From Swiss-Prot:
GO molecular function, one term: tRNA binding
Gene that encodes it: rpsL
Pfam families: Ribosom_S12_S23
Top-level taxon in the UniProt lineage: Bacteria
Keyword ATP-binding on entry: no
Protein name (database record): Small ribosomal subunit protein uS12
Misc remark: The streptomycin sensitive allele is dominant to the resistant allele in L.biflexa.
Role summary: With S4 and S5 plays an important role in translational accuracy.
Residues with 3-methylthioaspartic acid modification: D89
Subunit structure, as described in the record: Part of the 30S ribosomal subunit. Contacts proteins S8 and S17. May interact with IF1 in the 30S initiation complex.
GO cellular component: small ribosomal subunit
Length: 124
């Protein structure tokens, strides 16, 4: 415990805020190349085969990113755009792939929440 005199002389050191998505390096999105496309099983009590991809970013860092929506066209060597945002039931997955940009197609026949899945407006 410091004395009041020590606090006046030196003061307290600010606690540094840790980022939740360090691979983005303070950018909103980053481009990368898929090195592997695979499925993970979620934590208890959930059960599914969640689609994920290993992505080597332009910064040289390799991360695991979630592929949202039903169905995807991603393969190895596809160029993708990733954003921050973790998947609660997949440990270690802290990034999302943005649908409808670069080599990633939007979700087909999506009616609601289209902007989140890169789906075009359906013909009336």
């Amino acid at each position: 415990m410091p004395t009041i005199n020590q606090l006046i002389r030196i003061g307290r050191e600010d606690q540094k805020k840790r980022t939740k998505s360090p691979a983005l390096k303070a950018c909103p999105q980053r481009r990368g190349v898929c090195t592997r496309v695979m499925t993970f099983t979620p934590k208890k009590p959930n059960s599914a085969l969640r689609k994920v991809a290993r992505v080597r970013l332009t910064t040289g860092i390799e991360v695991t990113a979630y592929i949202p929506g039903e169905g995807h066209n991603l393969q190895e060597h596809n160029v993708v755009l990733i954003r921050g945002g973790r998947v609660k039931d997949l440990p270690g997955v802290r990034y999302h792939i943005i649908r409808g940009t670069l080599d990633t197609l939007g979700v087909d026949k999506r009616r609601k929440g289209r902007s989140k899945y890169g789906a075009k407006r359906p013909k009336a």
